[in-house]
């Protein structure tokens, strides 16, 4: 399912633990790492798609996690031209994503497994510091990651002080 602008509806999943770390997964047979994500099927809500993808990609079930937040908006990224499948119709130029912040029940960490549904998407995972993915994700996804992590920060890490607002500059002062 691709919308009229060429974007495929998709869900992104940020899974955090009680230490404010996030689950970072390595794509199967590759050196690139990312958050779990996947398409929204026809007739499926974003939340239904998120739980389906959570199980298919990570092996976790609805009872293993708690939804802490959902992104306010759909966030879009464009694929690099070299990754666009021009022969497919309709042409998909990128993804629009609804993001979910989940907290994993500490006792359920052992339930993480790959390949619960066909070919696995990932072959390894680890806990990383909250902002690490923004610096490490493939460049064309970086702005979406930055925006979603900024939106979820206060919920994922409530012990952090709020971001200070920039003081307005007064004329004549540097």
UniProtKB/Swiss-Prot annotation:
Chain span(s) of sequence motif Nudix box: 38-59
MF-aspect GO terms: metal ion binding; mRNA 5'-diphosphatase activity
Pfam families: NUDIX (PF00293)
EC number(s) given by UniProt: 3.6.1.-
Cofactor(s) listed: a divalent metal cation
GO cellular component terms listed in the entry, alphabetical order: cytoplasm
CDD domains documented for this protein: NUDIX_Ap4A_hydrolase_plant_like
Family: Belongs to the Nudix hydrolase family. RppH subfamily.
Protein name: RNA pyrophosphohydrolase
Native source organism of the sequence: Tolumonas auensis (strain DSM 9187 / NBRC 110442 / TA 4)
Lineage: Bacteria, Pseudomonadati, Pseudomonadota, Gammaproteobacteria, Aeromonadales
